[in-house]
C-alpha cells in the first residue's frame, strides 16, 4: 500500500534526517499493528523482495512478534545477496563493485532515485530484481529464501 505511514506515538528524532519522515508527516499515520496487518494481507501468496533481507526481515520479525504475536513467515528474495553472487561468481560483468542499492542501480544503467525513501527504495529494489532475473538463469527457488518457522 503506497503512502502508509506508521505512527507509534514516539517522536522520530534524528532519524528524520535519513528517511525524511517528520513528526508532522505521521499525524494521520496508523498504529504499528494496523500497518503490519496490512503488510501481512498484501504479502499472502507473494514473495517479498529486499536489498539486504537479513536486516529487513529481522526488523519485521521483531515488530511482528511484538505487535501480532507471530514472526516473519514469507519467502523473500535478497537482491543484495543475488547481486553479490553475480560479483563473486563467474560473471565478469559485476566483478568487485560495491553492492549497495544505488551501486547496483548504477551498474545496470538505472537512473538515480531518492535513497532511504520507502517507496523509491521499493521501486529501486524491484527494478534491480527484474534486471537480475533477466540476466540470470537462476530459478525462483535458487534465489528465494524460505523463512525459518520458529
Regions of interest found by a model, annotated:
Residues 121:
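Conserved catalytic/binding loops enriched for acidic/polar residues
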Residues 55, 81, 124:
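Short, glycine/acidic-enriched loop or turn micro-motifs at the edges of active sites
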Residues 70-75, 138-142:
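Short, structured loop/turn "capping" segments at alpha-beta junctions
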Amino acid at each position: 500500500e503506497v503512502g502508509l505511514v506508521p505512527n507509534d506515538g514516539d517522536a522520530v528524532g534524528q532519524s528524520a534526517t535519513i528517511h525524511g519522515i517528520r513528526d508532522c508527516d505521521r499525524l494521520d499515520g496508523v498504529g504499528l499493528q494496523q500497518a503490519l496487518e496490512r503488510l501481512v494481507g498484501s504479502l499472502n501468496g507473494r514473495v517479498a523482495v529486499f536489498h539486504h533481507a537479513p536486516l529487513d526481515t529481522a526488523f519485521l520479525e521483531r515488530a511482528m512478534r511484538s505487535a501480532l504475536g507471530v514472526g516473519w513467515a514469507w519467502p523473500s528474495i535478497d537482491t543484495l545477496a543475488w547481486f553479490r553472487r553475480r560479483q563473486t561468481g563467474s560473471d565478469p560483468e559485476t566483478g568487485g563493485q560495491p553492492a549497495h542499492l544505488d551501486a547496483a542501480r548504477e551498474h545496470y544503467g538505472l537512473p538515480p532515485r531518492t535513497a532511504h525513501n520507502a517507496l523509491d527504495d521499493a521501486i529501486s529494489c524491484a527494478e534491480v530484481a527484474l534486471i537480475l532475473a533477466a540476466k540470470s538463469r537462476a530459478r525462483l527457488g535458487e534465489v528465494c529464501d524460505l523463512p525459518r518457522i520458529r
